[in-house]
């Protein structure tokens, strides 16, 4: 399996880039670090699928008003979190987390729910790697094409990028999508899940920064020029080497993709 990640601020073109690769038959699909979190929030808070995926609806006030965080609610989340992991692959103790500072906090929009539960609770108090392990567990990957290429568009933190680089080695390629308007908005962002993309940008090679300052067709040409190509497993694989063939792609080609 090959993984291509697109990092960047909100509105930079990450999901659009992944959609282009899928429409062109290069990528088989997407894997989301936030996928398990969104499913949990749908179950616990009764959110419709569209409310946790649509970028506009995420910002809308909750239909029934604000939701107040309680210890009981957080314990319920903890219990469901365990269902997404294989304890032989990854284990943590969810009962050590403190609710101090979160109890009584109001959640007013789907985005606030995802940010507070995903970052303030799970990432900062339970385990920073839970969502990584949940999204890429053996169980989660079992239904995917092992010879396919998949896109990740929500690697917002440095440890997420490093996780992909370590887990997939030569079968991983990370890009930062830069769009002028989005970079301006990023300067005003206050939440870690938005600001931390700059730390990822700092470790991505300069040649892997995609400037998305033109039309959709311009972005498409740049993406197709990267030489990304999936679904071509080689017949022999040596330890530490990629098991895929890769297309040549000028300055973007570093021998891996």
What residue ranges belong to the model's regions?
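ATP-dependent small-molecule kinase phosphotransfer cores
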Residues: 35-146
């Amino acid at each position: 399996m090959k993984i291509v990640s697109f990092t960047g601020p909100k509105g930079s073109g990450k999901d659009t880039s992944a959609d282009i690769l899928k429409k062109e038959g290069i990528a088989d699909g997407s894997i989301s670090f936030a996928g398990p979190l969104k499913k949990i929030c749908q179950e616990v808070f009764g959110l419709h699928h569209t409310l946790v995926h649509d970028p506009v609806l995420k910002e809308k006030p909750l239909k029934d008003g604000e939701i107040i965080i309680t210890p009981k609610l957080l314990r319920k989340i903890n219990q469901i979190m365990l269902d997404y992991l294989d304890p032989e692959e990854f284990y943590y103790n969810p009962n050590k987390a403190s609710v101090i500072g979160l109890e009584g906090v109001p959640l007013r929009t789907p985005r606030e729910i995802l940010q507070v539960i995903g970052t303030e609770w799970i990432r900062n108090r339970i385990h920073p790697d839970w969502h990584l392990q949940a999204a890429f567990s053996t169980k989660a990957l079992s239904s995917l094409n092992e010879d396919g290429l998949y896109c990740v568009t929500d690697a917002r933190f440095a440890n997420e990028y490093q996780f992909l680089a370590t887990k997939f080695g030569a079968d991983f390629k990370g890009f930062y999508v830069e769009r002028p308007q989005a970079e301006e908005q990023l300067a005003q962002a206050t939440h870690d899940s938005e600001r931390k993309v700059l730390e990822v940008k700092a470790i991505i090679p300069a040649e892997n920064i995609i400037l998305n300052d033109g039309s959709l067709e311009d972005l498409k040409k740049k993406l197709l020029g990267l030489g990304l190509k999936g679904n071509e497993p080689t017949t022999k694989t040596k330890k530490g080497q990629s098991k895929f063939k890769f297309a040549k792609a000028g300055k973007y080609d570093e021998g891996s993709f």
